[in-house]
């Protein structure tokens, strides 16, 4: 019994290191831009298989998962199996099975990525401890701050590590982040910022407020600089979900006002820098609010002061009002899009037309990507509509569909810029249905266990990413993190777990009453002792696996 508990604890520490490596170390793993996609893919693939094999070895020698981690009646496990199986079918029936297996026809997101992310999901779900949220969130906050600072440096053409020394200026302007494509940065921020902001929203006491406030400060900077409309969509969706929860009070709104002040401060500063100094890359949608940076900062500060001093510490529930605001916002947005696109006589709304009217130019030509992806799927035979053209084969299928009518713009699209449309084309109706089943089964379980520690922030992070996916790409730089968050969500949804305490001992002296001796409570290790070993293991494993991936997957380079 004791050996099983010790092995389980060791496996839990290993799972913690795995999460730190993928969520915090892997986003900082970079190389020359020319091979960025395959470098990221092979690095995380090697890392995931290494940890999964290690945890599998611990399982074989007696590290049994806790009771309740897996159940034959759990729909989330069946949904995972359906997701993997439909990916397998689409790969076998692909236009090019080899390319689909490795994802060489797209953004290195083939069936191999489905396999190692599913294995990572099962490993984390089996052994990840329930009490890791605070430390994990803080580490994600540190990574967020580093990513944001490097992103800003490259906007001003400052490249600290020389990752682009062999790259043309035009490429630097298009992919201006030191950490690679803006799709990676926006996808990373889409799930990282809700974790960072939520930790700040619920922090109690001066120490924890400052501890989580610093990453939140850099999170406000990320909102002001990351060039991706999808990030605004994802964070907006997470905020709407948060407003509908019963935990939404005046205290929550007060902390949101602080985050708003952070954002407007950075947006105003970036607006000044862009107008007075050379910058490269695009300008985010939210950055337009930099024109009102000072006004927004003052309004947020005034709101914070009103809620802080006017209510004198009282917390008033706002979730009913929040649900009304969320319903009005969603209904109004849907109505505006419907009128702008389907009512010919709808009046122009000026610059908002660029956002509301979906055509080929919409969203930096995302409208073109959506149209050609949808038309390519419609033109497939029935069996391909059901099973798909193969994972990662969007570009190949589209080129065959377009034929001689292909345009230079169409040639640039290697993804649909909508994960759900791409899932429909590449894995067919079955694959899309399996993925939606996987998502819905997890979110339903989260809704039933919202008040359990850890469920709310991870759910908000996933909601943000899933909304972001409507206008983005499933890249190998982000999808492994998302699958691990789905696994972590299931761990947090479980009832509180604890190891069995040592049995009480009874001593009976001669002629005396029995005396019960209770065991001494086990002292919990400090923060450094708890997190230093898994953090060090995460860094070492990322470095080792990154180097080993060049040897193991050398044929892909």
Where are these regions (language model features)?
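TM-adjacent membrane-interface loops and short helices in multi-pass inner/ER membrane proteins
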Residues: 181, 365-412, 427-431
């Amino acid at each position: 019994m004791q050996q099983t508990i010790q092995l389980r604890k060791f496996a839990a520490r290993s799972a913690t290191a795995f999460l730190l490596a993928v969520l915090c170390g892997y986003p900082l793993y970079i190389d020359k831009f020319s091979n960025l996609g395959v470098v990221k893919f092979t690095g995380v693939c090697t890392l995931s298989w290494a940890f999964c094999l290690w945890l599998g070895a611990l399982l074989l020698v007696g590290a049994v998962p806790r009771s309740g981690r897996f159940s034959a009646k759990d729909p989330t496990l069946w949904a995972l199996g359906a997701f993997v199986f439909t990916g397998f079918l689409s790969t076998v029936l692909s236009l090019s099975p080899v390319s689909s297996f490795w994802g060489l026809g797209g953004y290195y997101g083939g069936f191999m990525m489905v396999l190692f992310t599913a294995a990572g999901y099962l490993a984390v779900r089996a052994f990840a401890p329930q009490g890791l949220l605070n430390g994990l969130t803080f580490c994600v906050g540190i990574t967020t701050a580093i990513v944001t600072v490097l992103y800003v440096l490259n906007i001003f053409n400052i490249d600290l590590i020389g990752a682009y020394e062999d790259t043309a200026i035009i490429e630097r302007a298009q992919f201006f982040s030191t950490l690679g494509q803006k799709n990676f940065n926006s996808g990373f921020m889409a799930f990282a910022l809700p974790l960072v902001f939520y930790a700040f929203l619920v922090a109690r006491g001066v120490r924890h407020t400052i501890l989580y406030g610093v990453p939140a400060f850099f999170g406000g900077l990320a909102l002001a600089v990351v060039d991706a409309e999808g990030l605004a969509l994802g964070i907006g969706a997470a905020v709407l979900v948060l407003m509908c929860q019963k935990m939404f009070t005046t205290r929550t709104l007060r902390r949101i006002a602080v985050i708003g002040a952070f954002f407007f401060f950075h947006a105003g500063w970036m607006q000044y820098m862009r107008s007075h100094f050379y910058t490269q890359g695009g300008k985010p949608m939210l950055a337009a609010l930099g024109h009102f940076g000072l006004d927004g900062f003052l309004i947020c500060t005034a709101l914070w002061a009103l809620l802080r001093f006017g209510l004198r510490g009282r917390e008033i529930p706002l979730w009913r009002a929040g649900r009304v605001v969320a319903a009005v916002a969603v209904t109004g947005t849907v109505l505006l899009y419907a009128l702008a696109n389907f009512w010919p006589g709808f009046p122009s709304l000026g610059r908002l037309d660029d956002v509301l009217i979906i055509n080929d130019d919409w969203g930096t030509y995302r409208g073109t990507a959506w149209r050609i992806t949808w038309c390519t799927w419609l033109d497939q035979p029935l069996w391909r509509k059901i099973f798909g053209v193969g994972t990662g084969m969007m570009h190949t299928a589209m080129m065959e569909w377009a034929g001689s009518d292909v345009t230079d713009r169409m040639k640039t699209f290697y993804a649909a810029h909508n994960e759900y449309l791409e899932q429909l084309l590449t894995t067919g109706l079955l694959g899309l249905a399996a993925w939606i089943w996987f998502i819905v089964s997890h979110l339903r379980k989260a809704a039933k266990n919202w008040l359990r520690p850890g469920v709310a922030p991870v759910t908000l992070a996933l909601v943000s990413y899933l909304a972001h996916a409507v206008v983005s790409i499933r890249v190998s730089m982000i999808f492994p993190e998302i699958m691990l968050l789905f696994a972590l969500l299931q761990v947090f949804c479980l009832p509180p777990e604890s190891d069995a305490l040592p049995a009480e001992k009874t001593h009976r002296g001669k002629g005396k009453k029995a005396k019960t001796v209770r065991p001494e409570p086990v002292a919990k290790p400090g923060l450094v002792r708890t997190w230093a070993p898994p953090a060090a293991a995460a860094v070492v494993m990322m470095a080792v696996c990154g180097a080993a991936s060049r040897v193991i997957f050398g044929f892909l380079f």
